[in-house]
């Protein structure tokens, strides 16, 4: 089976170019919903930042962003994007969520866009996110819920994940994902489906 890092390194080569008008709109909606929960003094952890599409939108609205991705090539593209746009308050690092350099209670906001459906140990990931947030910190996520209804995208990802050509994929239903976030110690503040097929659930939550 292909590793997560190798898979996302490969996807990085034309990731931005493959986002069609529909997905581009979903990213725009994600950014719009996110900005409503950001404050000028916030320190943000952008978990699985990818090529930095949403990171770039967040940057002018907060004090500092630590953007991380398991893929060194995704991280490199995000870093270059920040340089190209003159962004100086974003630090991009190739690492994972469990890097001990990320200290508990050190972030006002953690964002996780289009990544929760690709993590196999979701309980551990959500617990780690909670630990990294300051008391009352906000967790903002957008996740494909491939189990909500049958779609071509879902079938394709199921086949690829079961034949080893892409890593693990979770098939959440929207209510199931919302419940998992709540059970991890968060109060759900807002939920909205941003995309028809597959459903892409935006959840704004606060650490209890």
Predicted regions and their residues:
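Core SAM-dependent methyltransferase catalytic element
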Residues: 184-186, 190-208
């Amino acid at each position: 089976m292909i590793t997560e890092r190798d898979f996302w390194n490969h996807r990085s080569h034309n990731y931005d170019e493959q986002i069609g008008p529909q997905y581009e709109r979903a990213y725009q909606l994600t950014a719009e919903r996110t900005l409503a929960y950001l404050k000028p003094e916030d320190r943000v952890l952008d978990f699985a930042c990818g090529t930095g599409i949403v990171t770039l939108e967040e940057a002018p609205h907060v004090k500092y962003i630590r953007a991380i991705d398991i893929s060194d090539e995704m991280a490199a593209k995000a870093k270059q994007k920040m340089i190209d746009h003159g962004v100086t308050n974003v630090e991009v690092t190739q690492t994972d969520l469990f890097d001990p350099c990320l200290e508990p209670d050190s972030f006002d906001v953690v964002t996780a866009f289009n990544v929760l459906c690709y993590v196999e140990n979701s309980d551990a990931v959500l617990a780690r996110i909670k630990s990294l947030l300051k008391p009352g910190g906000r967790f903002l996520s957008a996740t494909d819920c491939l189990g909500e209804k049958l779609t071509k995208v879902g079938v394709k990802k199921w086949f690829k994940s079961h034949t080893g050509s892409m890593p693990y994929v979770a098939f959440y239903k929207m209510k199931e994902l919302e419940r998992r976030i709540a059970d991890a110690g968060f109060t759900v503040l807002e939920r909205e489906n941003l995309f028809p097929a597959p459903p892409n659930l935006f959840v704004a939550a606060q650490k209890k």
